[in-house]
């Protein structure tokens, strides 16, 4: 998994979610 540079501690992944990233361990990762 590649870190997308977005945190998802308080809110879900927003911008990076459009790039295919998902929340894992409080950080947005791309599979």
UniProtKB/Swiss-Prot annotation:
GO BP terms, alphabetized: defense response to bacterium
SUPFAM superfamilies recorded: Cyclotides (SSF57038)
Cross-link Cyclopeptide (Ser-Asn) residue location(s): 1-31
Annotated keywords: Antibiotic, Antimicrobial, Disulfide bond, Knottin, Plant defense
PTM annotation, UniProt: This is a cyclic peptide.
Tree of life domain: Eukaryota
PROSITE patterns: CYCLOTIDE, CYCLOTIDE_BRACELET
Disulfide bonds: 4-21, 8-23, 13-28
InterPro entries: Cyclotide (IPR005535), Cyclotide_bracelet_CS (IPR012323), Cyclotide_sf (IPR036146)
Keyword Disulfide bond: yes
A Pfam match: Cyclotide
Domain notes: The presence of a 'disulfide through disulfide knot' structurally defines this protein as a knottin.
Function: Probably participates in a plant defense mechanism. Has antibiotic activity. Inhibits the cytopathic effects and replication of the human immunodeficiency virus. Active against both Gram-positive and Gram-negative bacteria.
Membership in a protein family: Belongs to the cyclotide family. Bracelet subfamily.
Protein name per the record: Cyclopsychotride-A
């Amino acid at each position: 998994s590649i870190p997308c540079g977005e945190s998802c501690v308080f809110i879900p992944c927003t911008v990076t979610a459009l790039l295919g990233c998902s929340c894992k361990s409080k950080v947005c990762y791309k599979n």
